[in-house]
Amino acid sequence: SLGVDWSTTAHGDLDLDDGEINHADLDEEFWTALPVLEHIRTAARSRRTAPTAVLGSVLARASALIPPSTCVPPFVGGTVPLSIIVALVATTGGSKSATDRVAADILTNTPPGVGGPFALGSGEGAAEAYLERYTAKDDNGKNVNRQRQIKYGVIFTLDEGRVLTELGSRSGSTIVPTLCTMWTGGDPGRMNASAETRRTLP
């Protein structure tokens, strides 16, 4: 389950009902190290959102723009793509969605081959987001369903952590295992017998 006890997402070890959540922000040396980091911090502050949270959202969106052929070297095991999962933690009304909107305004250009943001719904739907279905003719001239991958990167979002908990707890749900597989660069699809339900990603 991504190494997280999802049953605690509503409150967990954070006492959200008693006072403020204490968190350490990144220091001044970090934010002034690169112009792009200063830009992110300035944009976040101008919209009254947390710079560190906006940085996380920017990184999540940026990772979808990087082709999967760009990988982390095989320090342990094999190579893995630069996929990232970011969880913004705050009380209800804590500007989580606003934070992501700031990130969207920072990264405004979505190149061909990148989709989203799409709301997560199911593991099968996550794999389907990369594909296009079309009809072709086989050797006998009969119409057959085919698929092809048209996206190399997709941005997925989920406004509330408890929604992922509910989705993952449903009988037969594949959403959490699929996220883990996609995060590590595996194929989240299924080689089913029926062409209508077959999903494979190279």
Residue ranges and their predicted role:
Residues 2-202:
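Phosphate-handling catalytic cores of nucleic-acid transaction enzymes
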